[in-house]
Regions:
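A short glycine-rich, Lys/Arg-flanked "PGG" loop and its adjoining helix->strand segment in the class I
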Residues: 147-160
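N-terminal auxiliary segments of SAM/dcSAM-dependent transferases
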Residues: 1-23, 34-38
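Short beta->alpha hinge that forms the Motif I/post-I loop of the SAM-binding pocket
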Residues: 93-97, 145, 169
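Conserved SAM/SAH cofactor-binding pocket of Class I
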Residues: 44-126, 132-135
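Core SAM-dependent methyltransferase catalytic element
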Residues: 192-204
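Conserved beta-strand signature within the Rossmann-like core of class I S-adenosyl-L-methionine
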Residues: 161-168
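A short SAM/SAH-binding and catalytic strip from SAM-dependent methyltransferases
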Residues: 131-144
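Conserved class I S-adenosyl-L-methionine
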Residues: 169-184
Length: 204
C-alpha cells in the first residue's frame, strides 16, 4: 500500500495551493495528492511551530542551523523562516513528490535549493549538525521506524545546548513515545493541547 512516506508515489499528481493565516502572517503552500495533510496545515505541526517560536523568542534567538526533519512539503521550515529570517533552514524528506513541493515552497521563501535534501532519515545529510531540529514523525511507518527517526534526529544535534522538537498525538502513542524520549534524552513536555503533545529534547 502506498503511503505519504513512500519514496515514490504512484497516485496521480494533482497540485493545489492552499492558504491560511498564522500568528498575523499569511502563508500559501503548494501541495499534491499522496502527501501528508495535503489540503491544510495540520494541527500538530502548527502547535509545534507556535511552541518553537515562543521558545526561541524567549531566548532571544535570531539565527542558527535548523532542520525540518521529515519535512513533507516544507510547512514547518517555511513558516519559521518568516519569523526568523536569519535562521539557516534545511529540509530532509524521503518522498520525492513531497520533496518537489518542498523545493517550490522553500524557494518562495528564498531558501536555497541545496538546503532541501532527499534522505531516508539522516542517510544523506552528511556532516551537518544542527542547533534545532523539528520532527512530526510519520506514525504510520510503525514504532520501530519512528524510534529510529527520533534517535537519528537526536544524533544530529550540535551540542548539549541544541534541541529537538517533536509533536505526537495522544491517539498515535504520545505517552509511549514520551517515555522513549525521556529514556534517550533530557526531555520535557512543552505543551499538550487538543490531543497533541509537543516535547523538547536535548542530549543528556
Amino acid at each position: 500500500m502506498e503511503h505519504y512516506f513512500s519514496k515514490d508515489s504512484l497516485t496521480l499528481s494533482k497540485r493545489i495551493t492552499f492558504g491560511f493565516d498564522f500568528r498575523g502572517e499569511h502563508f500559501d503552500f503548494v501541495s499534491d495528492n499522496a502527501v501528508f495533510s495535503k489540503n491544510q496545515a495540520d494541527r500538530g505541526s502548527l502547535l509545534m511551530i507556535s511552541e518553537i517560536i515562543d521558545f526561541l523568542s524567549a531566548r532571544g534567538v535570531k539565527d542558527g542551523l535548523f532542520l525540518d526533519f521529515a519535512a513533507g512539503y516544507g510547512l514547518i521550515g517555511v513558516i519559521l523562516k518568516r519569523f526568523f529570517p536569519e535562521m539557516d533552514i534545511y529540509f530532509s524528506e524521503i518522498n520525492r513528490r513531497a520533496l518537489e513541493l518542498c523545493q517550490i515552497n522553500a524557494s518562495a521563501a528564498n531558501i536555497p535549493k541545496d538546503h532541501i535534501i532527499e534522505s531516508d532519515g539522516i542517510s544523506n545529510i552528511g556532516n551537518l549538525d544542527f542547533d534545532y531540529i523539528s520532527l512530526n514523525p510519520p506514525i504510520r511507518t510503525g514504532k520501530e521506524t519512528v524510534k529510529r527517526l527520533i534517535l537519528e534526529a537526536g544524533s544530529k544535534l550540535k551540542n548539549e545546548d541544541s534541541y529537538l522538537f517533536t509533536v505526537i498525538g495522544k491517539k498515535q502513542g504520545a505517552e509511549s513515545y514520551a517515555k522513549f524520549l525521556a529514556a534517550e534524552f533530557q526531555s520535557d513536555r512543552l505543551t499538550y493541547d487538543k490531543g497533541f503533545e509537543v516535547r523538547l529534547s536535548s542530549k543528556k
